[in-house]
């Protein structure tokens, strides 16, 4: 059975959207992982009684002021939170479009039978 051109087009859009949605979800997951790591690092630094901490830079550890490192990490956390929020919004919009396309395809396939 040959599918009509509009159904083939919708099917291609559906497959492309599915791939894009998977990429968005993967990227969001990566940022969420980084965010948790940063938050854990800040938490561990706060437990430390020392005013200095060691920071990894290019494969070596460098002694740094704890307050400066905490500020850097806090800024990074803010950036990551913003990115995660952006990806959540994109994911939500794509998921809605995905569901709409899926329903349209199911209707079109049902009518063709």
Curated annotation (Swiss-Prot):
Its main location: cytoplasm. InterPro entries: PFD_beta-like (IPR002777), PfdB (IPR012713), Prefoldin (IPR009053). GO terms for cellular component: cytoplasm; prefoldin complex. GO terms for molecular function: unfolded protein binding. One of its GO terms (biological process) is protein folding. SUPFAM superfamilies: Prefoldin. It comes from the Archaea. Gene3D superfamilies: 1.10.287.370. Molecular chaperone capable of stabilizing a range of proteins. Seems to fulfill an ATP-independent, HSP70-like function in archaeal de novo protein folding. Belongs to the prefoldin subunit beta family. This is Prefoldin subunit beta.
């Amino acid at each position: 059975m040959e599918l009509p051109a509009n159904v083939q087009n919708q099917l291609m859009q559906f497959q492309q959207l599915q791939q894009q949605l998977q990429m968005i979800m993967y990227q969001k997951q990566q940022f969420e992982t980084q965010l948790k790591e940063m938050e854990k690092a800040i938490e561990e630094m706060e437990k430390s009684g020392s005013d200095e901490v060691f920071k990894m830079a290019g494969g070596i550890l460098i002694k740094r002021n704890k307050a400066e490192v905490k500020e850097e990490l806090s800024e990074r956390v803010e950036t990551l939170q913003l990115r995660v929020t952006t990806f959540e919004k994109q994911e939500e919009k794509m998921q809605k479009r995905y569901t709409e396309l899926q329903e349209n395809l199911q209707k079109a396939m049902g009518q063709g039978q």
